Design a protein with these regions (language model features):
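Outer-membrane beta-barrel architecture
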Residues: 30-36, 78-82, 127-133, 171-173, ...
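Residues that define the transmembrane beta-barrel architecture of outer-membrane proteins
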Residues: 21-29, 69-77, 118-126, 139, ...
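Outer-membrane beta-barrel translocator domains and adjoining extracellular loop/strand segments
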Residues: 14-20, 66-71, 104-117, 154-161, ...
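Transmembrane beta-strands of outer-membrane beta-barrel pores
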Residues: 3-14, 59-65, 97-105, 132, ...
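Short helix-loop boundary/capping segments
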Residues: 96-162
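Predominantly the C-terminal beta-signal and adjacent terminal strand-loop region
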Residues: 162-163, 170-221
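Transmembrane beta-barrel domains of Gram-negative outer membranes and organellar outer membranes
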Residues: 1-65, 78, 169
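Short loop/turn motifs that connect adjacent beta-strands in outer-membrane beta-barrel proteins
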Residues: 1-3, 35-55, 82-93, 133-143, ...
């Protein structure tokens, strides 16, 4: 199974683009491939609440045009437990090893003895993704999202310890097409929430913690 997520995030003037009064723009791409070990070995691996065991591999790619100018590149690999939830729902919990490279465009990162582009120490990351379907007033609804907890990964561009990073995004999505009597599982709308702590491992500085309500619209091809 493959997952590809491409997001574009536009900030307001509180987080401006470099040398600009307008908000910065960020692109974030995630790719994950789940290889079912049950299918590879042709042996059912279900046990209790677990329906399968998989191997997850993938990458993250990020770019943002603010003063910090992050260019995050991450490779991940590790096992995933896939839990039993009625389709189209799922719950996958992974323990991944990750290797990250990133960039810092701030002046202190370019000072003698510091680095503006580094490879962090390899680190473990706990990751979970879910989709729980149910009906609300006769309308098909999905509670979906993910969280990722990245543990410490060495020092940053100026030699300071990198903090543990936590990111969670959730959304409550309604099947608008089905509610309108059209094709189900095609068009969804909903509301969500993002909680991010120590963004990119930075800590004890402005702008690294976010609490963001979100609006979502999604079309399934």
């Amino acid at each position: 199974m493959n997952l590809v997520s491409v997001k574009m995030l536009r900030s307001d003037d509180i987080d401006p683009a470099r040398d600009s009064k307008h908000g910065a723009t960020e692109f974030y791409i995630v790719y994950r491939h789940l290889l079912s070990l049950g299918k590879v070995f042709d042996t059912p691996l279900a046990a209790g609440p677990i329906r399968d065991v998989a191997l997850t591999a993938g990458f993250d790619w990020n770019s943002k045009d603010n003063r910090f100018a992050p260019r995050k590149r991450v490779l991940v690999l590790g096992p995933t437990l896939r839990f039993k939830i009625a389709p189209p729902g799922f719950l996958d919990v992974s323990l991944l090893m990750a290797k990250e490279w990133n960039h810092c465009g701030l002046p202190p990162c370019k000072a003698p003895g510091n680095e503006d582009y580094i490879g962090f120490d390899a680190y473990p990351m706990l990751h979970a993704a879910w989709r729980v379907p149910f009906a609300l007033g006769g309308v098909p609804v999905r509670f979906e999202g993910f969280f990722a907890h990245a543990f410490r990964r060495g020092e940053d561009y100026t030699g300071r310890p990198v903090g543990e990073e936590f990111l969670m995004r959730t959304a409550l999505m309604a099947d608008v097409g089905a509610a309108a009597g059209s094709t189900p599982n095609r068009f969804f709308m909903g509301v969500g929430y993002e909680l991010w702590r120590n963004k990119f491992g930075n800590q004890d500085m402005p702008g690294v913690d976010t609490n963001t309500p979100t609006l979502h619209a999604r079309w399934h091809f």
